[in-house]
């Protein structure tokens, strides 16, 4: 079988409650700093202020698609920065995901955010093609998956794949509280809602060399699967969907065991149970499956932004020489059943 075209990351951008760029966000995560705080005015069903992680650089009065775009703009531009010194003009395909449709975030939200963000980015770069989806937690990784396919099919030279999410609409917070998903002293298995955006600029290794760009990481593989036994239902999850996503990923992967795992587990028991079963379904593929990182402990649950933000954590570790393993696995799961996983290798593997 012919060798597939190598996909590489040549730019990343991040904006989180911990920092307004990838470097500061990664440093805060590494130091274990938490941005979780009391909401200024929202009260939960126990009479306590809701625990959230918010972007303090954006006024709380800014809401809806406009808030999401304001969060997304700077990290998108950061991810594109490498093209500013490229040898020639480049055209970029934007693939964006937001959170799933929910109270406070109606149908059409993703399309609105995408259109507004495209308009802002068009002042700096030529955008061609792409798309948007309300993909939920797995959405950012789903964007990376589709970007890899787009690049390998020769439909674009560069893909800007990203996710942006914000849970801080009052209607959304009330809905989470009603569903017993908010973390509090009275509900230890809930999560702390956050807001963030993350982006990755992807291309083939051939194009990167043509443009004189230095790869930051190699995308060793990307996979998508579906889970039928979903959260907030009467069914029992046995890790079939996530286990399949891992299996698809490992089919064409190096035999080396995964040494670093970053995921979107957020305190909900469902996610922990699912991961445990998924690992059992893929024996021998992890150095230590119990040694995983959950950034939501620090920057809150950031939904669709999770995957691209995980990529930025690894690029920062590589850049500062504290990445200790050649293979990293990042994964996330949406409430709609979508499961996505990406396997990343260091820049040396792409050379």
Where are these regions (language model features)?
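Conserved "HGTGT" condensation-loop signature of ketosynthase/thiolase-family condensing enzymes
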Residues: 1-136, 142, 149-155, 164, ...
């Amino acid at each position: 079988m012919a060798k597939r075209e190598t996909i590489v990351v040549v730019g990343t951008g991040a904006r989180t409650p911990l920092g307004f760029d990838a470097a500061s966000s990664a440093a805060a995560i590494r130091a274990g700093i938490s941005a979780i705080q009391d909401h200024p005015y929202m009260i939960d069903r126990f009479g306590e202020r809701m625990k959230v992680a918010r972007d303090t650089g954006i006024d709380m009065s800014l809401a809806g698609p406009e808030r999401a775009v304001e969060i997304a703009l700077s990290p998108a531009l950061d991810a594109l920065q490498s093209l500013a010194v490229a040898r020639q003009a480049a055209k970029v395909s934007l693939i964006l995901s937001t959170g799933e449709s929910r109270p406070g975030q109606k149908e059409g939200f993703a399309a609105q955010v995408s259109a507004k963000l495209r308009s802002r980015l068009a002042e700096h770069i030529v955008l061609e093609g792409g798309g948007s989806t309300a993909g939920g937690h797995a959405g950012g990784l789903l964007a990376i998956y589709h970007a890899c396919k787009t690049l390998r099919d020769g439909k674009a030279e560069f893909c800007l794949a990203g996710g942006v999410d914000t849970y801080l609409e009052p209607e959304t917070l009330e809905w989470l509280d009603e569903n017993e998903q908010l973390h509090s002293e009275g509900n230890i298995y809930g999560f702390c809602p956050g807001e963030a955006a993350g982006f990755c600029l992807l291309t083939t290794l051939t194009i990167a060399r043509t443009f004189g760009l230095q790869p930051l990481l190699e995308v060793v593989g990307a996979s998508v699967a579906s889970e039928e036994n979903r959260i907030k239902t009467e069914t029992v999850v046995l890790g079939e969907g996530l286990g399949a996503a891992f299996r698809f990923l490992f089919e064409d992967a190096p035999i080396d065991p995964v040494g670093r795992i970053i995921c979107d587990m957020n305190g909900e028991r469902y996610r922990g149970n699912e991961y445990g079963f998924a690992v059992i379904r893929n024996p021998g593929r992890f150095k230590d499956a119990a040694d995983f990182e959950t950034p939501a402990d620090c920057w809150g649950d950031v939904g669709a932004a999770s995957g691209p933000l995980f990529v930025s954590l690894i690029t920062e570790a590589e850049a500062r020489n504290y990445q200790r393993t050649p293979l990293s696995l990042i994964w996330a799961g949406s409430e709609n059943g979508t499961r996505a996983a990406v396997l990343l290798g260091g820049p040396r593997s792409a050379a």
